[in-house]
Structure formats: structure tokens, C-alpha cells
Amino acid sequence: KIVIGPVFHESLTYLDEMKDLTFLSLTNKTLDLPKNVISAGINSTSQFNTIKKFLETNKIKRTIFLTPIQDYEFEVKKGMKNSKIKIYKDYEYNTEPTKITKQIEEITNYKVRKRNLDDEINRIKNSNDPNKERKIKRLEKRYTLGGLNFDAVVISDFKENLRSVTTSLLYTDVLPKNKYFITLNQW
């Protein structure tokens, strides 16, 4: 006998005691399921498989992964492992808003790139370049100077935390016109 439901992972407790039933649950969680429960929801593995295909199709080689230290962190890590997605670098971050920006600054080498810009402006100011005023004006419109060592960022977060991470990326001069921003569907 097959039962469709329950919907939520929290409702799966004690279902393993009903040995003669199989439950087709709409939960997207895959960790610690009773043996007689089949997860039919969109889970992290299915999402990472789709992201993997996107990265391969677009020939994106260096992808960093940002995973919050949250209660679903292990679900995300399991999805990454099961999908066999290529990981350039994997970072875990604290979701406290004041800490996110500092961590993103470190991940993106913001201070080094900011210093590169200041050094270049000073170098041009002290040069004999006839176009130095125009060059300085153009540089002063920027926040940083120098490349990033990744092509895409996968953010495994949702709601306000996702907004905080993307805002921190923009603040550190990581722009979606230059880098792919990829997020998971909330589950």
C-alpha cells in the first residue's frame, strides 16, 4: 500500500513503525528518512544536478560555493557530494549580517583589490601621462581594481540572508554582469 503524504519532514516521525505502508512524501529533505518513505520533493541533489549541467553547458570552470552555517547545511553538502559537481572553492559563512560582509570581503580579496585601485590612481597622478586626468577620473568611478579568481558563485541561502550575501557581493565589487550569481530554489 502506498500513501501520498505527509508533506513536511517534521511529520515523518514514527512512520517507520508502519511496516506495511510506503509513504510518498512531498518533503525535499533526504537526510534521516525512514526506510518506508520516498522523498518526492525537489531536493538539493536535484538542484545541484541542474546547476552542474548549467555550468558545463556554459563552460564555467571556477565556481565558488557559499553555504550558510544553518540547520540545512548538511542537506546542501549532501546534494553537492551526490551531484559530483566540480567545486573550485567551498566556503561556509556565518549568517549574522555584520559578519557576512567581512567574510565576503575576505573571499573576494576586496581589500587587496581596493588597495590596487588606490595604488594605480597614485601611480598615474605621479606620472607624466598626458591623459592622466581622464584616466584618474575613470578610475575614481570604480571601487576596486583587479580580477577575481572565480567565474560564478553558488549561494545556498534564502530570504533575507540571500539578500545580505548578494548585497555584500555587490559592495565588494562582484557584479552579476561579470560573474554568474546562482542560487538554490528554497526548500
Where are these regions (language model features)?
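Solvent-exposed loop/turn segments at secondary-structure junctions
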Residues: F8-L12, N28-D32, I69-E73, T95-T98, ...
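Venus flytrap/periplasmic-binding-protein-like
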Residues: D173-W187
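Beta-alpha junction/loop-to-helix N-cap segments that form part of ligand/metal-binding clefts
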Residues: K1-L31
